[in-house]
Amino acid sequence: LAVNDIVLTREGNIRIVQFNVYVNGTLLNTYLADGVIISTPTGSTGYNLSAGGPVVEPTASIIVITPICSHALNTSSVVLSAEDVIEVEVCPGRYGRQEEVALCYDGAVRRKMVSGDRVCIRRAEETAKLIKLSKESFMKTMREKMKGN
């Protein structure tokens, strides 16, 4: 389980990896990128934001897919319903080379993947209750954090 994000990113050699991303069984896009971030609203202000993804209000019921350093000019984040099922497939590299990818949940490497492997990502049936320690609104907190940017 992940609270913030699930990241697939290249492992070892510094080169882009090809990923096929499916939503509810239909191909959404093929990304040539350093990786792909699948983020919850809670995780949208972390790695997703650093990779150019949108900030999402924490109570929104959505999932964000953001490519990391995509090798294309027309790729941007995609915002989906939290009910959607996302599959990410690691594709073979140039000349059929076996690619190695790290699958990370909330920043910790959980497993290695290779060309042909797929991971299925969906919202868990379990829910978590989060404690809000500040009385400040989300918008005020975001405004304060973004001041220097």
Predicted regions and their residues:
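Catalytic phosphate-donor-binding core of small-molecule kinases
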Residues: 1-37, 45-149
